[in-house]
Regions:
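N-terminal capping/linker segments that flank leucine-rich repeat
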Residues: 2-91, 98, 103, 109-114, ...
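Residue-level signal for tight coil/turn positions that link beta-strands
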Residues: 38-40, 134-136, 164, 206, ...
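Conserved hydrophobic beta-strand positions in leucine-rich repeat
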Residues: 68, 81, 92-95, 108, ...
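Per-repeat beta-strand-to-loop junction in leucine-rich repeat
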Residues: 71, 95, 111, 122-123, ...
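Canonical position 11/12 of the leucine-rich repeat
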Residues: 75-79, 102-106, 125-128, 145-147, ...
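Intrinsically disordered low-complexity segments with strong compositional bias
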Residues: 137, 150, 156, 171, ...
Length: 278
């Protein structure tokens, strides 16, 4: 009888231990959900474990997250991503590749990321709004649905690129440290860069600009204004210009030693085709 009792007790203890162990295995930690490499880069998220609404932790294990680099169509399943806890975040890039139309991500908020320097997003077709922190130096927005964008807090921004989206209006008057500015395939009707005296590289293509003033940008080294309605470009006050790209037939006023390229309609069609293929 005692032996039977001991045997039953042993079996019950074994069951309890196995149940406890299986319970431990079911506990999901940040290490199971997020992969951070030795360079403090978050490069993988297991969406099966996190679900579509992501809250990124400050660190995974002892590894503090400083960079977020997500490059895969898999991440088109993300509905929201909260990075407010990532206090050491310096770099954020999200590229959904060719599944952008399936994305539901409408907003990115970096207002809490005081060390963030670079923001880059590509093929996030649902994205309508980005809230920046004043620390940002570089902003690159490709293939989004952003119509309006507030850049007033970005006094230290040095690089801004917007390409292929419905952008209607943008104000650069407070971005006086901007050195590189590129806008392509957007709905803007005018771009005022008079306040950008440090500007070195400017590109504007695939927009309905009728005229353009670069007289207040003495440090300008390259200018690309093609596939627009601009017919005259005055470079009289731009002695540092090294390269000019304009539509065929554009009148250039002022003496310049810059290399000049005139874009034909055939050139532009070829470029459009390459962009569509990529």
């Amino acid at each position: 009888m005692i032996r039977k009792y001991l045997a039953m007790t042993a079996i019950m203890l074994s069951c309890v231990i196995m149940l406890a162990l299986s319970s431990c295995n079911l506990t999901i930690t940040d290490k199971d959900k997020f992969y951070v490499d030795e360079n403090h880069r978050l490069t993988k998220i297991d969406l099966e474990k996190t679900g579509p609404d992501i809250v990124v932790p400050e660190k995974v294990g002892d590894n503090v997250i400083r960079r977020i680099s997500l490059y895969d169509r898999y991440f088109s399943k993300i509905d929201t991503i909260d990075v407010s806890n990532v206090s050491e975040l310096e770099f954020f890039k999200l590229n959904l590749l060719d599944d952008s139309n399936y994305s539901k991500l409408k907003m990115l908020d970096f207002s809490k990321n005081k060390k963030l320097r670079t923001v880059g997003v590509n093929r996030t077709k649902a994205l309508e709004e980005v809230v920046f922190n004043k620390s940002c130096r570089s902003v690159l927005l490709f293939n989004t649905s952003i119509k309006k964008i507030d850049l007033n807090v970005l006094e230290n921004m040095e690089h801004f690129t917007y390409f292929n989206g419905p952008l209607e209006d943008v104000d650069f008057s407070n971005n006086i440290n901007l050195e590189q500015l590129h806008i392509g395939n957007a709905n803007v009707k005018s771009v005022d860069i008079k306040m950008l005296k440090k500007l070195k590289n400017f590109g504007c293509y695939g927009v309905c600009l009728d005229e353009f003033d670069i007289s207040n940008n003495p440090d300008l080294e390259t200018i690309e204004v093609f596939n627009t309605n601009v017919k005259v470009l005055d470079v009289s006050n731009n002695p540092k210009l090294k390269k000019i790209e304009v539509d065929e037939g554009t009148e250039i006023i002022g003496e310049t030693n810059a290399e000049i390229k005139y874009w034909t309609k055939e050139d532009i069609e070829k470029m459009k085709k390459r962009l569509e293929e990529n």
